[in-house]
Amino acid sequence: MNRVLSKGPKGLNGLLRACPSNSGRSFLYHSTYNVSSRTFWSASRLRSEDSPSGSQPLKPDPNDGIGNNTSSASSQHTPWYLQEEALIEEPRQISSRDQIPELPENSPAILPVLLDYIFKDLGLDELRLIDLRGLETPPPIGANSIMIIGTARSVKHLNVSADRLCRWLRSTYKLTPYADGLLGRNELKIKLRRKARRARVASRAGTTVDEKDDGITTGWICVNAGVVENSPVGEQASRKVEGFGNIVGGTRVVVQMFTEEKRAEVDLEGLWLATIERDRRQKQVSIDTKSDAPHEEVRAPTPVQNSSSDHVFGPHCRSSTILPLEQRRGLHSKCRLLGPETEHNQEDGLDDGLDDGLDMSPDSISTPTDQLAANRTCDKEVDTDSLLEHLSGLPDGQVLSELGAGQEDRDSTPFLRRFYDALSQMSTEEAAVALVKLLCTAISRHHQGYSKESLWKAFMTCNYHTYPISDELGFEIVSALLTALPPHQKGPKATGVLPEADRELALRVLEHLSLRGTDVLNMKVFHLLYEAASHPTSFSGEEVIKDVTDATKDRPTSRVAKMIESLDIQFDPEDARKLMMSMFRNGDYDGFWNLWHKLPLYGSPRTSADYEMLFRLHADLRDECRARDCVSTWVPMMSREHPPIPLRGQVVQDIMHCLLIGEPAIDRMARAGSTSNLVLIWNDCKNIALGRGRRGSVERMNVV
């Protein structure tokens, strides 16, 4: 076998050639010494033995694509994660969620910073800026406002964004924003916990909790930043003013935050855009109407004063054009003033007395310039003010008779004739303000011919035309509207009843005053509100409450007192003393003593008039226990005041009256030789009243 199968490749090759193939195909073989990297061929061809394997390079079959694919794949194949995509040259579309709205003209300096903070730091989407300056905006927003509307991503994002915005405005710009609908950080967590607890309890009981308005998912928070810029907005060509109150110089910024569902439901921007479009159309119509109308001759608002060198002497010819609401004034040598003593005369005597009020005869005036200057001192506004001042000093009965039958009566009394005569010669602005003052006086004196509705209409007329109303006059209007019905009235409208409609009118006046910039959070306003709360709203609520200690907490006045304590109101000594008297008469003794102790702490030392009021109130109360405590405690304190209060005058009579209430038999006890503190005070007061001037007992009590 070894001889047949010779060793080496040649022997094996010969054996394979000698063996016939059963399938008609030859076996392919590879040399064990000459290994090729080529794979097996699929074609049925024999390899020539004569051709050496390594002499010439192998040429692949043209029909075989494996060689080409292998060589090209090694050079062109790249994994997918290393392949670079071709850059898209089309510009990226920026949605409205990623845009900051454009700034309007004459915008405040804080507006771009505020928009950037809301967009980048707070993360509100779909910002929309609406310029409401010049429009009639509702009172909660205020006049001259710029509104920003944004969308939060959730209820929690809404509350957190509003809270951060308020804190940022306070710390960065020292503003005082307020957010309607905002829940505090802890408050939101507590409410969410309670809601989850109720849901768990309901699920255990097999029921569902249906809370449509749980106070959490309102989805709307309004952050009013207030006035962010005090400089006035550029005046437009038109002088027309919309809304109520004076022209507000500053610009307000209001940020409206919504959730996506609530914003789509409310559609606030749609409402305001429709309002702006309607206002634009109205202005366009008015401009077209004015352009088509013929030009009219008008008088300049301020007369031009020529110098003395330009003055032309001689007759001055006036235009024959009749101007509407034209003032006609004449030069008089006498100023008509109404003295208090002339009102008691007869009707004829009153006319003479008014003409003889102040003599400015031509003898005392040398030149026409002096006559003109003297005439300017007798302005008609001062004339009406003097008439009203004289009227306010008269008793109630005489005031009612002087005011005539009612508002339509203008000539039944000398006062009405003089007043409306002066009113006809005044400008429309001055006449409207003077009429408001007359209505306030008439309503405060309980004249049935002058209604509170007419006062409200007169006030709104002044607001609509932006007539100047002082803060003092505004508070007089509120006081007149809060005046209770007269004591002598019978029937359903009983004594001291203040209807709810009158209270609502007074609160609306305070709201308009607040929009004009008037400080309504003061002692005077809260005293008026306290007085109004002490009156019942109907006949059924007029019953007197005897048990003060049990019913004080349920009274409406207690809520006003709590507001006074909680708010940081500037202390006004005069109004505080009035509020003290109202509290004592209403049974709020704790509030009375609280203000009584605050007087010296706020730099207003107690005076003799204060002690007279103290002892008189306790005497009128006719409570024996309170009267005794008041006398025994505060009579010795009079000498410790700074400066000390002397025991003399009217305060002595008030102390003795209070002692008689607290101890009816005190005079008999004094004659019996009692040495109690009240008897010692009684003896001192009695000696001072008799002119003996002894105060030894009170001084000994102070030492003790």
From Swiss-Prot:
* Region called Disordered, residue ranges: 47-76, 283-313
Membrane topology (UniProt): Peripheral membrane protein
Q: Which GO terms describe its biological process?
A: mitochondrial gene expression; mRNA stabilization
Keywords of the record: Membrane, Mitochondrion, Mitochondrion inner membrane, Transit peptide
Biased-composition ranges, Polar residues, are 66-76
Cellular localization per UniProt: Mitochondrion inner membrane
Transit peptide interval? 1-47
Gene Ontology CC terms, in alphabetical order: mitochondrial inner membrane
Sequence intervals crossing the membrane: none
InterPro entries registered for this protein in UniProt: Atp25, NT_sf
Outline what the protein does: Probable mitochondrial mRNA stabilization factor.
Family statement: Belongs to the ATP25 family.
The protein here is known as ATPase synthesis protein 25, mitochondrial
- Natural source organism: Aspergillus fumigatus (strain CBS 144.89 / FGSC A1163 / CEA10)
The primary gene name is atp25
